[in-house]
Amino acid sequence: VLALLGLVLWAGPALAQRKRSDAIDRSRKGHIKGITVENLSNYNQRFFRPGIYIAPSFSRFFIEQSDAYISAIQQGRGIAANSIISPGLAIGFIGDIRLGNVNTPFHLRFAPGLRFETRSIEFTGRGVGMPDTIRTQEVATTQLELPLLLKYQSNRRRNTRVYMIGGIKPSFAVTQRQNNQAINQLTINRTDILLEYGVGLDLFYPYFKFGPELRFSHGLRNILDPRNNTYSNSLQSLRTNTVTLYLNIE
């Protein structure tokens, strides 16, 4: 809330003096059909554009089973793992820098933020004294994310513009919580790096720009923290896959 208030206070004086460009639609006979106001007409002239975002997400682990699991399954026993799609939420700030003159389609975006999520894996035991028993392992984390992204945007059409975005996102687990350590024995590494790409839409309003953006993230590192327990021994690697809807305000 304080960040949003600060953004409005920063933008207020400039927007009070902004110039708007009006587009007039006329019929073949010259009659006026309507007038379209171009909001924030001087927006491209800004070299640096700050903002904030809130982003609901859904994530799951991409799982590779271990050789020990394959050997156990061949002997009629073992534990099978299945990742569950889990919701999350991210909040943060936006720093957007223009790369070139006012007409360049390229922008560099740095968007540090925090992500809160609890990821889960279901383990099904077979032939180990608890046939077909399902145990769920949960890993709750608060992550500091530092994405560095390249944005390629189309020409503006009145008050809308589409864009593509992609880059690299380092991620660091600030906290990692296990509600019941006797049950939740699975742990993951605290650092990760992800490949990100997506598409978005810029919508220009009189006092701000709103940009819904759909972004996909794929972890490049194996974040499994190997421990000597039944759950870790059945896994070879864990990688993060996430789909996030960013709601950007600049």
Please identify what each model-predicted range represents.
Residues 39-48, 100-106, 155-161, 204-208:
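Short loop/turn motifs that connect adjacent beta-strands in outer-membrane beta-barrel proteins
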Residues 190-192, 197-250:
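Predominantly the C-terminal beta-signal and adjacent terminal strand-loop region
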Residues 16-85, 250:
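Short glycine/proline- and aromatic-enriched beta-strand/turn motifs that initiate or cap beta-hairpins
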Residues 44-50, 85-89, 140-144, 160, ...:
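Residues that define the transmembrane beta-barrel architecture of outer-membrane proteins
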Residues 64-82, 117-139, 175-188, 224-236:
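Flexible, solvent-exposed loop segments that connect beta-strands
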Residues 49-51, 105-107, 149, 159-163, ...:
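Membrane-spanning beta-strand positions in outer-membrane beta-barrel proteins
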Residues 37-41, 52-56, 89-97, 112-114, ...:
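Residues on the lipid-exposed face of transmembrane beta-strands in outer-membrane beta-barrel proteins
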